[in-house]
């Protein structure tokens, strides 16, 4: 069993949500068992609006609201919901460290499995392996892992509390080996070796999605602080994308560029 160590400085509070299965513009529904994300990724778009939305004064990455009634609420909503694909999750990582304690994502998967709602799971955590037994019970399921760079030091800088690159690659390989449809999300494009990254993804990901750094103006100071300003330019995104595409095509891997 994989247990993750929680950040002792994290402010955690248990709350009761009013809704857990919500309409999405990307999939039919999205499901977020938590408000806040301990991974604290420097580039996360959620930090732009979720602190204000949640009413927290703490910086993004330093608070989590645990929706303790999520499984019960989901069970009720599924009784009247039209079947559709559920994205887990849109504004938090469903397998962030606190999930090893509360198991809300697992309990929600149990409810979704009873109704056979298709699921699309996206994470940066190897903790997803804990729930392979449940995921395998879905007739329609897809699991994606975000791997924005092959460089462990860069990943640690931008995604300080997420699983290591190696842990994510190993998880993706194991999930794929079980016959589950998989994808790798290379986004946002971070410094690294694109050819090596694609090589590592071969025979692990059925499809690769590529996206650039969005909201660059809000994170420019972060790049400047760590002397990475050259990786925050249109030239970098364009050239890095092309190197990824060239290597993907060379290896005849399916991909989609999202910008």
Task: Describe each region flagged by the PLM.
Residues 91-93, 124-126, 146-150, 187-189, ...:
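Active-site beta-loop-alpha junctions enriched in small/polar residues
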Residues 2-16, 22-23, 189-259:
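Auxiliary Fe-S-binding modules of radical SAM enzymes
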Residues 133-151, 206-219:
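Non-cysteine beta-strand/loop elements that form the S-adenosyl-L-methionine
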Residues 73-74, 104-108, 131, 164-172, ...:
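A general structural detector for well-ordered alpha-helical segments in enzyme core domains, enriched
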